[in-house]
Every structure is written in structure tokens, then in C-alpha cells.
A protein has these predicted regions:
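Conserved catalytic breakage-reunion loop centered on the nucleophilic residue
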Residues: 1-189
Length: 189
């Protein structure tokens, strides 16, 4: 199940519910993002390149195709169509859909009364391999994941924080980050 829209680079198969087909019009965007990443670019650098080269965002493409997100895009300046965020790029780089796998059970509701979503640990996810055509090879995907992991834990002084990857937000389940404000040198989490 992929929600209302297929991930960027794919379209929903009109003949088979829940199946994805490669979108020949947008697959190049995914290939470009992974190519930049495998050649050492980080998410911020990739985002900057996508904006500079005026690559359309997934939301803009959905607006153009289906008329969705009209409240965001209708009557807005053209730059909004290319306003990529680092979070979007990071999400794409971590998405196993692009190697042909479906991953389910990533999040759940806090309770039947509270519909707020929380991320589940990776060990509880369900992976179904080879459910659709891959856009990215598993080798390229693995290389990018290793680069992300190596880049994430490095500090400017070359050390790794002692609680790196261990301290999680109680509300959403994401890892907390520690840093120092560059202007006043105050630490923050």
C-alpha cells in the first residue's frame, strides 16, 4: 500500500492494485539523486543542485498531473515548483522502494484513541523483496546507505558522540542530535 500517490519515479499500476510501474517521465530524477549521492554528495549538496537545475519536486509533479496540493501551488511563484528540501532528499535516499522492495509497518498510531503516528523500530518493519521493477541497483543503494551512515556519525573533530544513534525522541522515535550553536557556542539537543 503506497497511499494516495506512488513514490516519485513510479506510477500506480492501473491493472493491479498495490503494484508500481516505473514512470518514464520522472525516473531520471531518482537516478540523478542517487548518482550524485554515490559520487559523494550529501543531502544538502544534492538539494542545492536540484534547486539550481530547476528539477521539479514530487509535490509539484502531483499538482501538475492530478491537480492536488492546489492550496500550496496554485498561483504561487515558479520557484515553489523547484523548492526541494534536505528532508525530501534524505527520505528518497533511504527509501527501499527504489531497489524494488516494499516495506510496510514502518509506523503506527499511539493508540486507538490518539491517531498520531510514531515510527516503529526497523526490526518490526515488514520487507517484501522484488515486488516491482527497481530504479536503482542494490549495490548503488548499499553504497549510498554506507555513505549516509559514515557521514552521520562524524563530528568536525573526527570523534563520534557517545550516544550517537541511541537517544530517541519519545514522541516520534527519531534519533536526537547534539550540536553546538556556532554563534554563542551553547550546546543543544
Amino acid at each position: 500500500h503506497y497511499g494516495a500517490y506512488a513514490p516519485l519515479g513510479y506510477v500506480k499500476d492501473p491493472d493491479k492494485k498495490g503494484h508500481l510501474l516505473v514512470d518514464s517521465e520522472t525516473r531520471w530524477i531518482i537516478e540523478k539523486i542517487f548518482d550524485l549521492a554515490v559520487h559523494g554528495r550529501g543531502a544538502a549538496s544534492i538539494t542545492r543542485i536540484l534547486v539550481e537545475e530547476k528539477v521539479p519536486t514530487p509535490g509539484w509533479l502531483n499538482f501538475q498531473r492530478y491537480g492536488t496540493f492546489a492550496n500550496i501551488y496554485a498561483g504561487t511563484p515558479e520557484e515553489k515548483a523547484y523548492a526541494w528540501t534536505i528532508a525530501q532528499v534524505k527520505s528518497i535516499l533511504k527509501e527501499e522502494t527504489y531497489i524494488g522492495h516494499s516495506v510496510h509497518n514502518k509506523q503506527t498510531n499511539i493508540s486507538f484513541k490518539n491517531k498520531k503516528k510514531v515510527r516503529k523500530p526497523k526490526e518490526e518493519w515488514y520487507r517484501v523483496e522484488n515486488t516491482h521493477e527497481a530504479i536503482i541497483s542494490e549495490d548503488v543503494f548499499r553504497q549510498v546507505q554506507e555513505q549516509i551512515c559514515n557521514r552521520r556519525r562524524r563530528q568536525k573533530n573526527g570523534t563520534t558522540q557517545i550516544f550517537s544513534g541511541l537517544v530517541k525522541c519519545a514522541d516520534c522515535g527519531w534519533s536526537l542530535a547534539y550540536g553546538v550553536n556556532s554563534q554563542n557556542k551553547n550546546p543543544y539537543a
